[in-house]
Amino acid sequence: MKNIVYFFLVLMLVSCSNKEVLLPQVDRTIVATVEDHSPIYMFFETKEKDTLVDLNRKNSISSTNWIFNIDKRLPLKLVIPEVIKMQAKKSGSMHNNAESQNYFSYSDSIHKKLAFVPFTKVVYKLEKPKTGVTIYFSKNRILVDSVEFNKEKLEEYIENLTIEDLYKCNFCFDKNDSYGNFVKNYVFATTLEVKRTQTDTYIF
């Protein structure tokens, strides 16, 4: 019973304002713990037929690691502009610590615990890449230059690339996808990029 209750709490975070955030679920952990952090919340809200982001950054301290707790139901096209603004706010602060990191939080569905994936150096671009190979994650599909791949085929493709060719790969995500699906795909993409330091990520 304790395990069931604990996992329920991991799936759903409750902020100081008693609002709920339904976290994405992913079957692996990238980072298990984050010390000295500030929470950033993005809540799911609706007004008539519109979906809205309710951003709460009241407890953010620029010198700390920032953990973005974002509701998985939100569309990516609403989330990323807010993330970009918060990245700029932190980097532009006179109190910013160059060693601090930014993380997305999610629930590890296998180990039933809270987990995190870093995105500190990622530069989000709300456009299509103009050059290079496009690896496009759209809901349950992966397209490499418009050719459909499954995850195993993409892993093999990435493993066989030289570092030079890997630099030419652009990781892209569907702006109309949910944030929950984005995090699943982003965590998977993170595991593929071990040889790569390119930080541009495209949302279109």
Segments predicted by a language model, with ranges:
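Compositionally biased, low-structure terminal segments
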Residues: 8-9, 138
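Long, low-hydrophobicity, acidic/polar, solvent-exposed interaction domains
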Residues: 17-204
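C-terminal motif of bacterial Sec signal peptides marking the signal peptidase cleavage site
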Residues: 12-15
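Sec-dependent signal peptide recognition
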Residues: 2-7
